[in-house]
Amino acid sequence: TKPYFDDQFGREIKWDLPLLGGYAHKSLKNFSPSPSSEFWGQINPGVIKEIVRNKPDLLLVYGWNSLTNWLAFVTAFCFGVPVVLHGENPLNQELLKNRIRLAIKRLILTPLFGCVSAFLYIGEENRKFYEYYGVPHKKLFLSPYAVENDRLIGAIDKPREGRGELRRRLGINEDGVVILFVGKLIDKKRPMDLLMAYENLKDSNKVLVFVGDGILKTALEKYVDERDVKNVHFVGFQNQTELPKFYAAADIFVLPSGVGETWGLVVNEAMCFSLPVIVSNMVGCGKSLVHHGQNGFIFELGNVEELTGFLDNLMADKNKLNSFGRESFKIVQRFSYKEDINGLLQALDYINNKNHL
């Protein structure tokens, strides 16, 4: 994959793990004058030719927020190719939209969903989203959002050995309780909520580590300097092979994101390292990965006082920290690529059985 400039990170990004190896692939030319993840940012008419020429047994489409996806839908429907739709929209965020927008969206999605053969949902809120728009239960198959559990878990021994080394490099003593944030420092992620909650903590052993870059970094650093908040570390963007060191050196993981955080794969990653996790009630993975009071806590979006209380609760009890971490590790085992494949295979079986009736 080629390096690219990420506006939200505010820097050029080149992932240090291969993303295109191990499978056949073909990239279609994008004719959009302004390529992006927006609707008009993906215009790949070549998808029509590919579907017509190959007439696949099944077409797997991720979302409906681009012209290319709609070209794929229409072509597949016209040529009798079954479509499996994979989306990520959580219902709790959907219901925050105004009634007029929801009504218009229902007019668009109802006929589209009626033509789709099967649906893959990533978690509980996403399943509820599909049901809200009238998708019958029999067409829904769980294909949870997952990360490379095996690679991350396999990296644990080596990073654990370097846990003390990384802490020493950052000036963190062995008794320090490290609270970790991983992600872009942007409005959607709400890192300031975490910084304010951290400031309120009374434990003198508290440490906060921000992994990532973004437009809010300057404001966060200014807040730390002006209010003399102790033991806050900004380590910048860390690539995929470096991240395990930071998860291994941490004690608690927090993702305080707001609307737009449809899942939060960094939570999966943190749980692979047996970390207790705290997320806001708008983080899409919350109801699937965070079992409140068992492996972490879910706080009301923007409620800094509640977040502070949950952090205090964990930091005051070392045994709870450890038991929550063990529970996180157990839970994330059910969110793996194997489960993704099982969901797709179940959808295929459903389509084949339906076609043979």
Predicted features, each with a name:
Residues 237-238, 245-250:
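Short alpha-helical donor nucleotide-sugar binding micro-motif in glycosyltransferases
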Residues 248-262, 275:
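Acidic donor-binding loop of glycosyltransferase active sites
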Residues 218-238:
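Nucleotide-activated donor-binding/catalytic signature segment of Leloir-type glycosyltransferases, i.e.
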Residues 173-189, 195-198, 209:
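Conserved donor-binding/catalytic core segment of Leloir-type glycosyltransferases
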Residues 109-164, 234:
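Donor nucleotide-sugar binding/catalytic pocket of nucleotide-sugar-dependent glycosyltransferases
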Residues 168, 306, 313, 320-334, ...:
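A short, well-ordered alpha-helix in the C-terminal region of glycosyltransferases
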Residues 276-280, 290:
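Short hydrophobic beta-strand element within catalytic cores of glycosyltransferases
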Residues 82-86, 90-115:
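Nucleotide-sugar donor phosphate/pyrophosphate-binding loop at the beta->alpha transition
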